[in-house]
């Protein structure tokens, strides 16, 4: 039988795990009790900083399989041939809530993917919506503060939340999605995923094309009403996590169809909307979806903390054949995500097994807290050197990216104030019953927000479509004419 006797961290057997050392049966605890001190000290440090956003999450391993040839667009090895399979890890999450938040709350859902390719890890850090509230990362900390707890009373504040959202009219597209029936997915298995940002593909000829990534659930879309969600939360705050775990355990593996949209650099220069604006989508009629592969989740983690809580996703992690774009929000995340992981997990978080590349890597980074991989041994710690170590690969350079204009703090609202056309298009695509749910969900979510904030939201909705603003005003029980007065 395997030896499962209790030991201290250094391997020393523990003689007594029931009673502390004391001076006499009623006497004080002895500081010399090594197991008591070790056990308490480790307990005091068990909790690492939680993610500032996406704190409550669930994860699973799986496989990405290529079903369609896209090698004319990208030289990324993950897409190199039809039938190729790549191991991956996916973490789903709610966004605004803390670790103890309920899974079935009305919120955006995170959909973060890590592909363990032979060229390195590719992290596609997405959500279940194709857009976001913001197009400038300078306002991301403000969004966080608005949707988190109020600094005075430590309670969530509809007033703070909606005050911020309604003062940024470009947020209306995301707000409309969040307040729609899709604002509460029935489970992680029954929602779509999106890379959301614009990225770039680079092919064998080093030609660039812009790309957006989509994952369409093959289980079908299923959502919850507010009332259904409230009933579930009353009984099970881990409903989405339980559904994902149990479905994989019984062999009912969830799948998503992996698709892309493509836009040439010339098309981007001349298109009527800014293709790098995260508050807008690329219309499918102009840039149709193209099938690429299938993502299947088929293995649960063995330990939640080690594999889900310590997983770290960073959009900076790309592979050859995939690149970035002028998307401002993407560029902000390129810094912020890695910086947050270094704070949360340490500078060597890539050595944690769930984050570690499956291919050889030689990153030149040395030392730092919790360095456990040999630290590159006696290899030289500088470059250039005379010993052929740490050489770069100039043949891997991307083509030059054209930029336009002078460096300045440009106010994008001065040359792009089209905040309402796409939310209006989305509203008009909804059948009447979904529009009514949108009105009612919005009214409940606004709760006790001040009247002038509700009126401001009605004005924003009315600009997207008069029926949208009218319906929200009626659901809120406020006078439409008064609300429309600027």
From Swiss-Prot:
Keywords: Heme, Hydrogen peroxide, Iron, Metal-binding, Oxidoreductase, Peroxidase. This is Catalase. The gene is katA. It comes from Bacteroides fragilis (strain YCH46). GO terms for biological process: hydrogen peroxide catabolic process; response to hydrogen peroxide. GO terms for cellular component: cytoplasm. Homodimer. Residues 1-28 are annotated as: Disordered. The keyword Iron applies. One of its GO terms (molecular function) is heme binding. Its EC number is 1.11.1.6. Its cofactor is heme. The active site is at 54, 127. It catalyses: 2 H2O2 = O2 + 2 H2O. Heme binds at residue 337. Decomposes hydrogen peroxide into water and oxygen; serves to protect cells from the toxic effects of hydrogen peroxide. May be involved in aerotolerance of B.fragilis. It is an enzyme of class 1 (oxidoreductase). Belongs to the catalase family. Induction: Up-regulated by oxygenation and stationary phase.
